[in-house]
Regions:
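N-terminal leader/targeting and accessory segments in enzymes
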Residues: 1-91
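Walker A (P-loop) phosphate-binding motif
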Residues: 91-97
Length: 97
């Protein structure tokens, strides 16, 4: 599914990234593969954003992360910032699957 279609209505995706073909959604960086959308879920013990670079190195094409995450992070892929990562994760998964 195209990134723009997957996020439509919830996340503003820059036009140059809207045509990225997402083949998998992952919140575990160790499971990311080529074509993944990595969702950096903040947690109590650790923060998913700490693992975004690993997900990208494994082939993730974009990252969904909390507001402010893009500042100071140049992962080489779009970082789509959202207010509530867990809420968006459910919506994205529902639309994708």
């Amino acid at each position: 599914m195209l990134l723009g279609e997957l996020c439509n209505g919830w996340i503003s995706v820059p036009a140059e990234y809207g045509e990225l073909e997402i083949v998998q959604i992952e919140c575990d960086s160790r499971e990311a593969t080529a074509g993944s959308l990595f969702i950096a879920v903040p947690g109590e013990a650790t923060d998913g954003l700490l693992y975004a670079a690993e997900a990208v190195s494994r082939g993730a094409l974009a990252v969904i992360a909390p507001q402010g995450a893009a500042e100071g992070n140049d992962l080489g892929v779009p970082i789509l910032e959202v207010e509530d990562v867990r809420d968006i994760m459910g919506k994205i998964a529902d639309r994708f699957y």
